[in-house]
């Protein structure tokens, strides 16, 4: 049975995983306790970061957000990839954002579909140059070329055309993106059934909302239908808060920083439980008079994850282009 308001199919398909999971489960008592604490603090999600995100012009900004989230995946590795920008050192997602901003400020035409369609591995290596190499460099180069080609062929080089076609619907834009751009089709198989996550497509929509302050190309009437963005950091935070529980064998593998294969039952269970851990927390907050959408709860948890104490269980390590 489909969950009400789940036109994306993410809640419905991940619910089946949570109900059958063998290695990951949700602690409902912990959900209630954390909801009480968050409601008492009147926590609010972070605002769009304009220091590290590039912004210049309406259509160029829309194309930039597409590029940003086309390569918004897999930052872990040893040694950890870092870059220096404006006198500070960044790693992870913020290194990605700063790298793209640095390149655009240096005149690299990253918002031009024809340039993207022909971008080389060396070009991409230069854009992300820093300490160490960004993981999955070849995949990022391939995806940027694919993104440029689709953008040129399907949308005349303007992602704003795709946004306009969605008619202020976040759900419609996720559908357009996942159908047009193959790298955004974040779907797994669990016990013979398809499971949808659409992490980067959904975060793309929420990033448009943030970058445009909820107006113009960032205006959507159904943002509340987005789910959490199942990545590395949010499940780590949920586990730290006690909302996610892991079977001992999986807990030990994570503690050893052992790689969890993409598409494995354990990886799919972690991601599905992340979707529902956030959804249950959202509902618990709403019942306590603190209404947030799932994507806002996700933003809040991701931001909390930037300040986890030493000794926190490491996030799961999976080599994938989807997150």
Swiss-Prot record:
Active-site residues are: 231
| Keywords of this entry | Hydrolase
For this protein, the record's InterPro entries field holds: Q_salvage
| Gene Ontology MF, one | hydrolase activity
A single GO BP term for this record reads: tRNA-guanine transglycosylation
Question: What superkingdom heads the lineage?
Answer: Bacteria
Which reaction(s) does its UniProt entry say it catalyses? Answer: queuosine 5'-phosphate + H2O = queuine + D-ribose 5-phosphate
Q: What is the similarity comment for this entry?
A: Belongs to the QNG1 protein family.
Its function, per the record, reads: Catalyzes the hydrolysis of queuosine 5'-phosphate, releasing the nucleobase queuine (q). Is likely required for salvage of queuine from exogenous queuosine (Q) that is imported and then converted to queuosine 5'-phosphate intracellularly. In vitro, can also catalyze the release of the q base directly from Q as substrate; however, Q may not be the biologically relevant substrate. Shows a very low activity on queuosine 3',5'-diphosphate, and cannot release q from queuosine 3'-phosphate and from the 5'-nucleotides AMP, UMP, CMP or GMP, indicating specificity for the queuine base.
Can you state the subunit structure given in the record?
Answer: Monomer.
Can you name this protein? Answer: Queuosine 5'-phosphate N-glycosylase/hydrolase
Name the species this protein comes from: Sphaerobacter thermophilus (strain ATCC 49802 / DSM 20745 / KCCM 41009 / NCIMB 13125 / S 6022)
Q: What is the lineage of its organism?
A: Bacteria, Pseudomonadati, Thermomicrobiota, Thermomicrobia, Sphaerobacterales
Gene this protein is translated from: qng1
